[in-house]
Amino acid sequence: MKQQSEVKSLKEGKFVIIDDEPCQIVSVQHSKPGKHGAAKARVDAIGLFDGSKRSIVQPVDAKIYVPIVERKNAQVISIAGNMAQLMDTADYSTFELEIPEDLQGKINQGEEVQYMAAMGKLKFSIRQ
């Protein structure tokens, strides 16, 4: 899910959609180019799910889409290789997620972990 917001309201650490990918904002720079030009903002961000850097330059009064990012808890049901089967603790739905390399060996069966959900995609939460 997503909602509209103005570019001037974006802040570091918040989220924005660039190239149909939810991204976390790393920096926002505002500039006024000239006497008759409108102020512009450069937004640099990193993709939540693919980790690639993206940037956009837009007028500050332009509308842009912001993803609704939810952090939820889930219990690890089973682990097979680098895949973990999880059950959401709120609605008891089950799903599989790939375990990132930095978390492999640290996640055990029966533990409760955090994950992020945005625009139909899921990922283990950055804050473990």
Curated annotation (Swiss-Prot):
Subcellular location as annotated: Cytoplasm
Pfam families, sorted: eIF-5a (PF01287), IF5A-like_N (PF21485)
Cystine connections: none
One annotated GO biological process: positive regulation of translational elongation
This protein's UniProt keywords: Cytoplasm, Hypusine, Initiation factor, Protein biosynthesis
Molecular function in Gene Ontology: ribosome binding; RNA binding; translation elongation factor activity; translation initiation factor activity
Metal-binding recorded as keyword: no
InterPro entries named in the record: IF5A-like, IF5A-like_N, NA-bd_OB-fold, Rib_uL2_dom2, Trans_elong_IF5A_hypusine_site, Transl_elong_IF5A_arc, Transl_elong_IF5A_C, Translation_prot_SH3-like_sf
Hypusine PTM positions: 35
Chief place of localization: cytoplasm
CDD domains, alphabetized: S1_aIF5A
GO cellular component, one term: cytoplasm
HAMAP family (UniProt xref): eIF_5A
Purpose: Functions by promoting the formation of the first peptide bond.
Record-stated family: Belongs to the eIF-5A family.
Name this protein carries in UniProt: Translation initiation factor 5A
Lineage: Archaea, Methanobacteriati, Methanobacteriota, Stenosarchaea group, Methanomicrobia
